[in-house]
Amino acid sequence: MTTSLLLRPRWVDPSVMFLYDNGGGSDEVSKNMEGFAGGNFAANQCRNLMGHPASLAPSTAYSSCDVPTSAIGEPVKQCSPCSAAQNSSSASLPYGYFGSGYYPCRMSHHSSIKSCSAQPPSAYGEKYMDTSATSDDFTSRAKEFAFYPTYPSGPYQPVPSYLDVPVVPTISAPSEARHESLLSMESYQPWTLAPNGWNSQVYCAKEQPQAGHMWKSSVSDATSHTGGDSGSYRRGRKKRVPYTKVQLKELEREYAANKFITKDKRRRISAQTNLSERQVTIWFQNRRVKEKKVVNKLKTIS
């Protein structure tokens, strides 16, 4: 026969309840339950607790052999068998009626424990109370869910932080390297674990030279549309503007007359061909270099 004991927490209500299985050994049970003291415990409290099962929900289940006592020298008061247990000894009770029976009941509150003789397990002990676990098993269960119990270990690896992203040096001018370092700080976006976080753009160092090339091409296009007089854009190379046939004919005629142009001729040709004086000067320089290359090539052949 198994005797179950229910104790409420010491800081709420120091009450004790004894539940007996009316199997014919009530005298033997009263002898085995000697030495349990519960403060202001009366004989009729057992019936009161059985009549209000809602008060038993936050309590803790203890076995008859591992019950902490709050006092030693107080006189022993025994509880008579409960009427509810006598009338319905074989009735089925809902699970959790005697508190949580999952964890072991070997608990100590710095008080003396008086053990009684071992009793064979009965139907109530096997069905409503699990005392097979030990204190070591209790601590191991607590360690399993100690930290982050709601985050499962999925197949994804930890996402690298900003310091883990390798920096690939690129071959560029000193001025361009300064701009690339600033762009890498601004365009970086850390990875997030949001549902749409994996689809967001991630910084890649290999994409920076391509972005710089696109920026240069846009600047060169802007300078080509502004005209020849605007010299504010010095970064990109201007687009080459070919000369017309009328302009080339006038320039070739002056070059045949004199390879080196004077200031008066330059102003006159600039007014006739609608070109700047600088363009006329550059054309004469390039024409002399071209003729020199042709002469050197003929000398090497001959």
From Swiss-Prot:
Chain intervals for the UniProt region annotation (Disordered): 214-239
UniProtKB keywords: Developmental protein, DNA-binding, Homeobox, Nucleus, Transcription, Transcription regulation
Single GO MF annotation: DNA-binding transcription factor activity, RNA polymerase II-specific
PROSITE patterns to which the protein is assigned, alphabetical: HOMEOBOX_1, HOMEOBOX_2
Portion annotated as DNA-binding: 236-295
Function summary: Sequence-specific transcription factor which is part of a developmental regulatory system that provides cells with specific positional identities on the anterior-posterior axis.
The protein's name: Homeobox protein Hox-A13a
Name of the coding gene: hoxa13a
